[in-house]
Amino acid sequence: MWDDNGVDWAHFDLIVVRSTWDYPSRRDAFLSWAESLPRVLNAPAVLRWNTDKRYLAALGIATVPTTFLEPGDELVAPGRPFVVKPSVGAGSIGAARYDAGDTRARDHVRRLHSAGNTVMVQPFLDAVDHDGEVALHFIGGDFSHAVRKAAMLPLGGDPGEGLFVEERISATAPSEKELELAERTLDAVPFPRQELLYARVDLLPGPLVLETELTEPSLYLGYAEGAAERLAAAIADASRGR
């Protein structure tokens, strides 16, 4: 665990962030830990920028339209199905999909606000039920592989309390437009892409960027031949300072 005080982090040449999925409830402590490490990837500045999804507003590319509600802001529900989730979150914690006019959404927003969260409100795109989302993975700034994920949030479902809603994953080849948008997304990140050990760009039909995962994304290495070897080689190079 990243918060295990018994670990001598200075003993390691390189720490690679992977499964720190409990950080949303104590983001400040997580970032302080990362900043205390001798060498960590992705870098602490990347983690600070990426662990609050308000970064989406600064990318300047085609993203899923998002309204951010600060504590005290009231929800004006879209006239179509929509998704409510916290801006600091991992997996499907705190996320739920609602139909237009569902009054439970306001209660959901208030609960998130009461916990100190900024809330994201996004339209649910109808094509997601059929096409799902495509996740494009990059290692050392270079495209590695992609998977397709089926729609995960059922209409009217309860906000996720565990780390994950069950996923259905399959290997896929991204379209030319999807790859081009993912490449532009990495170029829009305010850090040199070659310095990103790993990155995952999640796209919805359009294509539109849903998220750019630079902190602790599942990389689905088992869905692409050679992906694990590419990551291992990149870690080895980084540990040698290359």
Question: Which residue stretches match the model-derived regions?
Answer:
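Phosphate-binding site of ATP-dependent enzymes
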Residues: 99-191, 204
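ATP-dependent carboxylate activation and anion-phosphoryl transfer catalytic cores
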Residues: 174-242
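ATP-grasp fold ATP-binding core
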Residues: 59-60, 66, 78-95, 116-131, ...
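Conserved N-proximal alpha/beta basic substrate-recognition cap immediately N-terminal to
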Residues: 1-71
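Short glycine-/acidic-enriched loop or helix-start segments at secondary-structure transitions
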Residues: 26-27, 52, 93-95, 131, ...
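Short, solvent-exposed loop/turn elements at beta->coil junctions and helix N-caps
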Residues: 2-6, 72-73, 122-127, 200-204
